[in-house]
Amino acid sequence: QQTQVSTVLSYYERFLERFPTVLALAEATQDEVMPYWAGLGYYARARNLHRCAQVIVNEFQGQFPRSSEQLATLPGIGPSTASAIAAFCFGERSPIMDGNVKRVFTRYFGIYGHPQKRAVDQALWALARDVVAQSPVDLNMAAYTQGQMDLGSMVCTRSKPRCEDCPLQT
C-alpha cells in the first residue's frame, strides 16, 4: 500500500525546512532525522535516505549521481528506482521494472511464471531494455516511464483490469 501524496506533503515541507540540502541531511544524526519522518511509516526509507545523503556527500562530493548505475549504489535504491530517478531527472534511456510495469509486460508479452522468480525477472528486464533500445532516440523517458507506471496502476490493474481501455490492444 502506498502513502498518498496529500498525506506526505506536510511532512515533506517540514522535512525540507529542517534539512534544506543534502549536506544538512548528511550532517544530521539519525536521531535528528527520525522525528521528521514519524507518522509516515516505512522507517527504513528514512534511514536509507539519511545514509544516501551521507554517501552523496562523502563519495560523490555532494553531487547527486546522474546515472542509473551510480544511483543503484546508494543505500535502499534498487535498479528500478535508480532507473526511474535517472529517467525523470536526467532523461536517461534506462527502463524501470516496478510491480505495475511487470504486470503490463507479463500480460502484453505473454510471459508466464511469477515475476519474482529470477528467470522471469531477467526476461522482463531484457524485454524492457529491448523496448527502450528500439524506441525513437527522441523518446521522452520521463513521459514513457510515467506512462508505464500509470498504465499498470490504472488500467492493467492486478484485479479487474480494464483491458478494453488498454492502449496496447491490437
Residue ranges and their predicted role:
Residues Q1-L168:
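Catalytic cores of DNA base-excision repair glycosylases
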